[in-house]
């Protein structure tokens, strides 16, 4: 039967199962059980629920099944007809569509052969057990829930935000010995089928003993594995993952990992944050512009400083040039050695801060940086201006929302230090040209990394209102072109505005 028509629950259990399968095919997170109930085990039934949302052993569902198992078939049907289950919140649905909606609220749905209604047996719904707060993707406004190590729990967190039967959770296995559960989450009528097939093919193209984290999947499935720029977007936020799914993208989640992989992705996706869409467009645009500038300076600022001080001092105002010269008096090293000393010190502090326990790690990063910088200046190992430049560069890298994306700029920073120390501004231009050329040839599952500036026609570009600037939410009426969704329109109003 068409999904747009109301389908009554039938007394024929087989027909009800077929109708539920129409909605929940390719849903590895939906538990479907056919069983026999009754004292004589002669009453066929079909039970379905989101796996992590119901505990059959201790919940109301378990008590209900135990009660029905003590009755005869006629008594079971009579009990259901008279609504005498003894559960105050039990709901009876006359149509399949209502049963589908009830299932997506996190409750269990029971069909009994010979009974023309579906029974929703109340439970705790979507639980909070095991859900952690996100540390790596802090937002000013929005949910604090984060993914955990259970792939089933993570899929339920996405379903909690998108209660549609069109959300599919395709289950795969990875690792010959580990046999790790991998889920592909997408919206059936939005995600491009070719994209889903390509992702599934890439994930099955290799054989390995074990997959212990989603990072291993990421490295094995990337085509241009040598690039410092990630071709998979990572997230620990269920709301970020749900937002990507609604754009027509696909989420890859791996058991024992709290990190979801978003595909395809592009440069701009790494700059956006979840609260860009929860805040007013003026605030979101300002923050986004800062992050774009931060990504540029995190890569080029130390190299720019070396180019100015070593090759192009004539472009500086005289007073500023004298200030630079005075600051470097007594420093025994050339400028490039100064910069490398401070950069490596900051990177070492950052690494130490990550490895140490929470509060201690933060203390090492902040206090250690201040102490080392001050001591280095007082010992005439580096000039104060270098400490300022390196500190500002570190701040810029912290402003980039995605850690893997920020790491790419941290690596390229040393490339720019080398070419600028050797060739000055000419080296800076060559470096920028090399990075831009690399980015223009980089793709994520066939989607250009610099979309829509590369690989899109003018109409696609005009449709996009969500890049460096974020236009008012009411104007963001089309899904991004880079995901190539089946349906582009995502927002309509009843009256023209």
Spans of model-derived segments:
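Generic detector of multi-pass transmembrane helix bundles and their immediately adjacent loops
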Residues: 304, 317-497
């Amino acid at each position: 039967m068409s999904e747009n028509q109301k389908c009554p629950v039938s007394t024929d259990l087989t027909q009800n199962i077929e109708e539920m399968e129409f909605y929940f095919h390719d849903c590895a997170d939906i538990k479907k059980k056919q069983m026999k109930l009754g004292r004589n085990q002669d009453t066929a039934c079909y039970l379905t629920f989101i796996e992590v949302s119901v505990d059959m052993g201790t919940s109301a569902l378990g008590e209900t099944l135990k009660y029905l198992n003590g009755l005869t078939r006629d008594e079971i049907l009579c009990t259901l007809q008279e609504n005498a289950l003894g559960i105050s919140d039990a709901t009876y649905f006359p149509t399949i569509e209502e049963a589908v909606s009830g299932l997506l609220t996190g409750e269990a749905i029971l069909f009994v052969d010979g009974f023309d209604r579906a029974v929703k047996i109340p439970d705790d719904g979507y639980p909070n057990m095991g859900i952690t707060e996100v540390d790596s993707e802090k937002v000013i406004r929005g949910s604090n829930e984060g993914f955990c190590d259970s792939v089933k729990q993570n899929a339920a967190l996405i379903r909690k935000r998108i209660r549609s039967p069109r959300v599919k959770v395709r289950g795969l296995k990875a690792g010959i010995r580990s046999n790790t559960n991998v889920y592909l989450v997408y919206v059936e009528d939005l995600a491009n089928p070719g994209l889903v097939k390509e992702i599934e093919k890439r994930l099955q193209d290799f054989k390995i003993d074990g997959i212990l984290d989603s990072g291993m999947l990421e490295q094995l499935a990337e085509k241009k594995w040598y690039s410092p720029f990630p071709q998979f977007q990572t997230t620990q936020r269920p709301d970020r993952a749900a937002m990507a799914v609604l754009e027509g993208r696909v989420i890859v989640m791996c058991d024992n990992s709290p990190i979801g992989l978003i595909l395809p992705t592009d440069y701009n996706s790494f700059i956006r944050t979840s609260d860009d869409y929860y805040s007013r467009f003026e605030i979101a645009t300002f923050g986004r512009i800062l992050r774009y500038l931060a990504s540029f300076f995190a890569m080029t600022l130390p190299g720019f400083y070396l180019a100015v001080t070593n090759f192009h001092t004539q472009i500086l105002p005289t007073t500023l040039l004298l200030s630079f010269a005075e600051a470097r008096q007594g420093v025994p090293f050339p400028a490039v050695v100064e910069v490398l000393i401070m950069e490596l010190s900051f990177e070492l502090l950052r690494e130490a801060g990550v490895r140490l326990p929470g509060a201690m790690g933060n203390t090492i990063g902040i206090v250690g940086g201040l102490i080392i910088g001050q001591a280095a200046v007082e010992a005439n190992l580096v000039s104060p201006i270098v400490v300022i430049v390196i500190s500002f560069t570190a701040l810029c890298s912290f402003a980039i929302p995605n850690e893997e994306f920020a790491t790419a700029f941290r690596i390229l920073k040393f490339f720019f230090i080398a070419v600028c120390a050797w060739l000055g501004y000419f080296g800076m231009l060559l470096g920028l040209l090399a990075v831009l050329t690399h980015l223009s040839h980089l793709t994520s599952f066939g989607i250009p990394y610099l979309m829509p500036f590369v690989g899109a026609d003018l109409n696609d570009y005009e449709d996009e209102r969500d890049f460096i600037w974020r236009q008012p939410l009411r104007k963001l009426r089309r899904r991004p072109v880079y995901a190539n969704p089946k349906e582009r329109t995502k927002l309509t109003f009843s009256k023209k505005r």
